[in-house]
């Protein structure tokens, strides 16, 4: 879907979901709001600033208030109006010549307020081909309303460069309460 954006704060909002990338290489063309548009073709996704040479450079940001402490790496966060128990995430690379800039390793965090985070998963060794998604499973039984994906390494092993993703999908189950039945949720 289409997010309403605030370029000054790098914040995007749609139907109660709030998405915030840690940086953007080109805020007008690759701000990150297209990570949730269901399209992984060329020209759709998010590019971070130049923060990698295989692994994250010391100049890369760090997700604050994480337990255990988050590693250095560009990150994206999403806040939802409802808590879910996350079962897994799927990420796809930017398409075309950008598949080598996709996440190769990283960590997943959950939170309740968008300010404090708990590690709930990790991944490594990812490679990609055009149109391919990689899945990251989580084992947490806790329901969270906020999630973060921290990228610690990219697939490009030759050049210092930015990180790019074409699509970020989250799958889980809504918290049961107030007379509601649990339902599958996809963001």
Named regions from a protein language model:
Residues 1-7, 29-32, 37-121, 130-182:
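Aromatic, loop-rich ligand-recognition surfaces of beta-strand-rich domains
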Residues 183-187:
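Low-complexity/repetitive intrinsically disordered segments
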Residues 10:
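Polysaccharide-binding surfaces and accessory modules of carbohydrate-active proteins
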Residues 18, 22-27, 111:
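Short linear Ser/Thr-Pro motifs
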Residues 123-125:
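Residue-level structural signal for beta-strand termini and adjacent loop
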């Amino acid at each position: 879907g289409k997010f309403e954006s605030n370029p000054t704060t790098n914040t995007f909002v749609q139907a109660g979901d709030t998405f915030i990338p840690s940086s953007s290489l080109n805020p007008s063309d690759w701000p990150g709001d297209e990570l949730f548009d269901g399209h992984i073709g060329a020209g759709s996704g998010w590019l971070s600033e130049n923060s990698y040479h295989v692994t994250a450079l010391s100049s890369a940001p760090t997700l604050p208030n994480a337990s255990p402490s988050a590693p250095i790496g560009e990150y994206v966060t999403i806040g939802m109006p409802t808590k879910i128990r996350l079962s897994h995430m799927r990420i796809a690379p930017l398409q075309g010549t950008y598949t080598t800039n996709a996440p190769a390793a990283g960590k997943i965090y959950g939170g309740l307020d968008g300010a404090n985070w708990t590690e709930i998963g990790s991944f490594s060794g990812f490679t990609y081909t055009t149109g391919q998604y990689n899945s990251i499973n989580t084992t947490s039984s806790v329901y969270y309303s906020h999630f973060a994906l921290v990228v610690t390494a990219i697939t490009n092993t030759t050049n210092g460069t930015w990180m790019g993703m074409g699509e970020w999908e989250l799958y889980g189950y809504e918290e049961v309460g107030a007379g509601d039945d649990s339902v599958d949720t996809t963001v």
